Design a protein with these regions (language model features):
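Non-transmembrane, aqueous-exposed alpha-helical and coiled segments at domain scale
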Residues: 1-256
């Protein structure tokens, strides 16, 4: 992994090294030394022979500090001042709504808030400063790694979606799981993000399919649902999609 989870553990444990700490070498040294001691203890419990050295990490941070320090600033004040001056600010979030640590498909989530509310927190501004929220959604569904994907396509169709859509991890090249369009997920995302507009991408990927299975609801333990249940309500049960096939022939005819 890339250490994202452990970094958040340190943050919420109030023991992480922040970029601003690089201005104070004595504070950085204290935090790094304590962190290395914890890491080595955990490695030992796992039976690993490898260990970390504080001096190595401190040397690396010392070399990075001159390059990073000029960019330290109060992001919230910068954004707020820009808005007060009549400027426009675009906040771009990462990852999908269902990876949100609070509102996603827990425990198959990331460590941060990936919904629109997290943009205000991350930028250091109040939620009323955000006047429009644009949601970006593909014309089909993808997921990286484990976790629920109710509309996951069968192998040949999944591979077709993956190849046509270029669904491979940007960093690792890891193939993404692919499925059909899921309006239940989109509806949920609209609600938890407070979307004011929606942009649907990669419609052309579906051109080669004669029919498209579209999810119209879920079945969970025999009960028909028209919305995405939370993890507690699902209780570990498997969501089964109810699907209708849509013929694309008529959709390809452009009215004159």
């Amino acid at each position: 992994g890339r250490g994202i989870g452990p970094a958040y553990e340190d943050k919420y444990g109030r023991r992480g090294v922040r970029v601003g700490d690089l201005r104070h070498p004595e504070i950085t040294a204290k935090l790094v030394t304590a962190g290395v001691e914890r890491a080595n203890a955990m490695l030992g419990l796992q039976g690993a022979s490898a260990t970390c050295e504080a001096k190595t990490i401190l040397a690396m941070l010392s070399a990075l500090a001159p390059r990073l320090l000029p960019f330290i600033g109060d992001a919230g004040r910068i954004v707020s001042d820009t808005l007060k001056a009549g400027g426009n600010v675009l906040l771009e979030g990462a990852q999908g709504a269902l990876l949100d640590v609070d509102h996603g498909t827990y425990p198959f989530v990331t460590s941060s808030s990936t919904t629109a509310g997290g943009a205000a927190t991350g930028a250091g501004i109040g939620p009323t400063a955000i006047h429009a929220v644009l949601g970006i959604v593909k014309a089909y569904t993808t997921r990286v790694g484990n976790g629920p994907l109710p509309t996951e396509a069968e192998a040949p169709y999944e591979e077709q979606l993956r190849q046509l859509g270029g669904e491979f991890g940007a960093t690792t090249g890891r193939p993404r799981r692919c499925g059909w369009f899921d309006p239940m997920v989109v509806r949920y995302s609209v609600r938890v993000n407070g979307l004011t507009a929606l942009a649907v991408t990669k419609l052309d990927v579906l051109d080669s399919f004669a029919e498209l299975p579209i999810c119209t609801g879920y079945r969970l333990n025999g009960q028909l649902l028209d919305d995405l249940p939370d993890a507690d309500a699902a209780g570990g049960g498997r969501l089964a999609p109810t699907v209708r096939d849509r013929d694309l022939a008529a959709a390809r005819v452009v009215p004159r």
